[in-house]
């Protein structure tokens, strides 16, 4: 299962549609608090999350990392800069994308991070 955390409904729907094409199951969250509750409820195989959303930010990313150690994390943001990227990578984000994100690159990162899990059903 891939957790998609994005406050913009249109963007979240687009991301989910693209990930469905990879054959993964999806759980959605509209803000950081909902994403954290989701991680506590069911450990995802990967987390794809926006940075700037209600209850978001780098502190939220650090909390996600605490509650989901070892789970690959992909970060997307409209408000990126080199320092934010460096800080995110330092706290354990495996892939970082500025919006507008190139969907082919995003899907490539998801494939790479999920690896062999894409060959079978992802829970």
Regions found by a protein language model. Name each.
Residues 47, 51-54, 79:
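The short loop immediately C-terminal to the conserved phospho-acceptor aspartate in CheY-like receiver
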Residues 83, 101-114:
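C-terminal output helix
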Residues 37, 58-70:
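Short amphipathic alpha-helix used as the core "switch/output" element in two-component signaling
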Residues 8-27:
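Two-component/phosphorelay signaling modules centered on CheY-like receiver
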Residues 111-123:
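The C-terminal output helix
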Residues 28-46:
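Acidic, metal-coordinating helix/loop segments flanking the phosphotransfer/catalytic sites
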Residues 59, 80-97:
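Alpha4 helix (beta4-alpha4-beta5 surface) of REC/receiver domains from two-component response regulators
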């Amino acid at each position: 299962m891939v957790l998609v955390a994005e406050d913009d409904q249109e963007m979240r729907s687009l991301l989910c549609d693209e990930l469905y094409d990879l054959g993964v199951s999806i759980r959605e969250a509209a803000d950081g608090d909902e994403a954290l509750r989701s991680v506590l409820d069911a450990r995802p195989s990967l987390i794809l999350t926006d940075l700037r959303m209600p209850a978001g930010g780098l502190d939220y990313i650090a909390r996600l990392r605490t509650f989901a150690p070892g789970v690959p994390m992909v970060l997307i943001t409209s408000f990126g800069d080199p320092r934010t990227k460096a800080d995110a990578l330092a706290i354990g984000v495996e892939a970082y994308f500025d919006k507008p994100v190139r969907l082919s690159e995003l899907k490539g990162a998801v494939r790479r991070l999920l690896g062999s899990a894409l060959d079978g059903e992802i829970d």
